[in-house]
Amino acid sequence: MTNIEQSNEKRQRSQAVTQTEWEQYMAEKILRLIRHELYMDFRYMDVALSALSYQPKEGIDTLGTEGDHLFYSADHLLRVYPKNPVYLNRCYLHMILHLIFCHPWLQGSRNAADWDLACDIMIEYLIDHMEQTSVQRITGLLRRKVYKRLESVG
């Protein structure tokens, strides 16, 4: 056992933590890993990627923000990350891009559902065309059709 491992083991024994505390710790570790992976592909977004402070919020099945905090469910992150880390990378970047483009604040008198859908489609279009490893996924037929139609409109 290395000195670092011994030190970590000693620290863990002296700091009894609850299951909930451990889950929060691991969830925030996952969020830092996601942010780091995105940073490796999008170095120019370093300030934006680190602008939100993490805030646990149980009962949500995705990531969320109001512009200051990144809301997450530890249970959701711990369940999804091992199976599909790219999905979480995309969710994180999706939120950041919404904030960069000021989507939450530019709705005005537009229909909220239509505005949200239009902004989501635009953000996903951008992410799908970034062609970076951290967010790359297979583009399904429906997405390709929607993108082709949008591109033809102009």
Where are each of the predicted segments found?
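Short, functionally important secondary-structure microenvironments
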Residues: M1-N89, I96-G154
